[in-house]
Amino acid sequence: MLKRDQSEMDIEAETANMGKEEKESFVHKRQKYRQEQEEKRLAAKKGVSFEQPEDGEIKLPKKRYYRQRAHSNPFSDHQLEYPESPADMDWDVLYPNRKEGQKVEVADIGCGFGGLLVALSPQLPNQLILGMEIRVQVTNYVEDRIVALRHQNKETDGYQNISVLRGNAMKFLPNFFEKGQLSKIFFCFPDPHFKQRKHKARIVTTTLCSEYAYVVRPGGIVYTITDVKDLHEWMVKHLAAHPLFERLTKEEEDADPCVATMLVETEEGKKVARNEGDKFVACFRRKENPEW
């Protein structure tokens, strides 16, 4: 039996209640929309102009044209591009206005549709913020969202400090970031992987905690939030057990403006709030390196 392409299954789910003509019309519109957005995205990356609407305004992307499943298998071969080392990464492609020598300091792992990135941009105006997302269409949506926001705020150079790339942080994080490069790293509503045999695919594990300790500088913060209590306890257990992390006190968390932003600005967080669900937060500080 042939394995169907993910996009085919997404289309079936989206058009399940549509008639034949309505379904064909929707598929055609989505293909045309995605093609137009891809052309704009490539043009923006190359720094060349592209045809704009008559009113000169680049509109924010429409989420319905970027449908994709909620999660992706991090162990699958996703044919990702990644640098051999951080020194090989061309950050100017993602941040055209960055200052010479300026490096990414904040990472949102599994950034979803970019709500936290957009909220953090004006909050941390002097820091480069990167979202990493493994799903193709979700990454494309965030790229298009940033292109539109930059265009809409070009007079003030708004949103020049955020960007997104498609990548697998569980495999290639040290390929992008140097030792101690990050001051903040966010894990917002990650895949809970409920089944015990899937726990190895969780974004916080004993092995991965060591990688996070490598890329986060002493004094830097690891932010976690989830609506799944079991996952919250799992992340707390593994981070607390690592010798290079210590948990922030409740008072320290309450005083951190990034925690307040994380609680309300992600798309998943807003969904949890609408459903009156719980949100579990835990933040950990990177300890100083031991003296050998």
UniProtKB/Swiss-Prot annotation:
Active site: 191
Family, similarity comment: Belongs to the class I-like SAM-binding methyltransferase superfamily. TrmB family.
The entry's keywords: Methyltransferase, Nucleus, RNA-binding, S-adenosyl-L-methionine, Transferase, tRNA processing, tRNA-binding
Self-association state and partner proteins as the record states: Forms a complex with TRM82.
Enzyme class: transferase
Pathway(s): tRNA modification; N(7)-methylguanine-tRNA biosynthesis
Subcellular localization: Nucleus
Main localization category: nucleus
Keyword Transferase in record: yes
MF terms in GO: tRNA (guanine(46)-N7)-methyltransferase activity; tRNA binding
The protein's name in its UniProt record: tRNA (guanine-N(7)-)-methyltransferase
Biased composition (Basic and acidic residues): 19-42
Sequence positions that bind S-adenosyl-L-methionine: 110, 133-134, 168-169, 188, 266-268
Pfam assignment, any one: Methyltransf_4
Region (Disordered): 1-54
Enzyme Commission number(s): 2.1.1.33
Enzymatic reactions: guanosine(46) in tRNA + S-adenosyl-L-methionine = N(7)-methylguanosine(46) in tRNA + S-adenosyl-L-homocysteine
Function: Catalyzes the formation of N(7)-methylguanine at position 46 (m7G46) in tRNA.
Regions crossing the membrane: none
UniProt-listed Gene3D superfamilies: Vaccinia Virus protein VP39
PANTHER family per record: 3-DEOXY-D-MANNO-OCTULOSONIC-ACID TRANSFERASE/TRNA GUANINE-N 7 - -METHYLTRANSFERASE, TRNA (GUANINE-N(7)-)-METHYLTRANSFERASE
Gene Ontology annotations of biological process type: RNA (guanine-N7)-methylation; tRNA methylation
